[in-house]
């Protein structure tokens, strides 16, 4: 028999997207480790043909294994979070049946291009991750992930000197492209910028209200 939710507010669903290698899984790992003592968390990861991100999150100890579900999307990972999000909506439903009092459901998309966005039916807040190693031109390329996500994370700023990227140019371009929407620059692996991301989730998601 499925347990009923005892908390007043519904769970907050946070979508984490971005190109392959940008640091989505690392961000998710760091968020889980930093927030798990204060909030009831579950996570859903998307991969095209494997459950590699689920395995990585489990090995890292981000959350207990039963709180992490891997979804194999097949084909285009964009479709599974936007046009036909049914596979992920079903995964959310299954996780909430097991953990009805979850405060946050993290949904990590499979690596995709700059046009990827989450269906509003699937995600309440969207975080889009790009990285400095992709070049300083990435923010000005635009695309819904960069311009329309609730929070943009420009990751791996520590690599800027090694790839010839100007953080000043990236910051200026991000500010122009975002049109007032927030963005964070940092290196989530070392924890730089993580507190800002958590504060954003807590404030915009009204956690603890």
Swiss-Prot record:
GTP binds at residues 18-25. It comes from the Bacteria. GO terms for molecular function: GTP binding; GTPase activity; nickel cation binding. It is found in: Cytoplasm. GO terms for cellular component: cytoplasm. Transmembrane segments: none annotated. GO terms for biological process: urea catabolic process. Keywords: Chaperone, Cytoplasm, GTP-binding, Nickel insertion, Nucleotide-binding. Gene3D superfamilies: P-loop containing nucleotide triphosphate hydrolases. InterPro entries: CobW/HypB/UreG_nucleotide-bd, P-loop_NTPase, UreG. Facilitates the functional incorporation of the urease nickel metallocenter. This process requires GTP hydrolysis, probably effectuated by UreG. Homodimer. UreD, UreF and UreG form a complex that acts as a GTP-hydrolysis-dependent molecular chaperone, activating the urease apoprotein by helping to assemble the nickel containing metallocenter of UreC. The UreE protein probably delivers the nickel. HAMAP family: UreG (MF_01389). This is Urease accessory protein UreG. The gene is ureG.
């Amino acid at each position: 028999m499925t347990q009923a939710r005892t908390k007043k507010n519904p769970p907050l669903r946070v979508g984490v997207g971005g190109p392959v290698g940008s640091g989505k899984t690392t961000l998710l790992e760091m968020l889980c480790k930093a927030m798990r003592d204060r909030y009831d968390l579950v996570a859903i990861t998307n991969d095209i043909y494997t459950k590699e991100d689920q395995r990585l999150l489990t090995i890292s100890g981000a959350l207990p294994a039963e709180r992490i579900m891997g979804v194999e999307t097949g084909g285009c990972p964009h479709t599974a979070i936007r046009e036909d999000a049914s596979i992920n909506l079903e995964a959310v439903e299954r996780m909430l049946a097991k953990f009805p009092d979850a405060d946050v459901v993290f949904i990590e998309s499979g690596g995709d291009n700059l046009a990827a966005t989450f269906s509003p039916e699937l995600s309440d807040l969207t975080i889009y991750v790009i990285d400095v190693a992709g070049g300083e031109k990435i923010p000005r390329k635009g695309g819904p992930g960069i311009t329309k996500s609730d929070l943009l994370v420009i990751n791996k700023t520590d690599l800027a000197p090694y790839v010839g990227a100007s953080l000043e140019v990236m910051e200026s371009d991000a500010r122009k492209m975002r049109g007032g929407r927030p963005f964070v620059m940092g290196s989530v692996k070392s924890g730089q910028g993580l507190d800002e991301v958590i504060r954003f989730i807590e404030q915009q998601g009204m956690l603890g209200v």
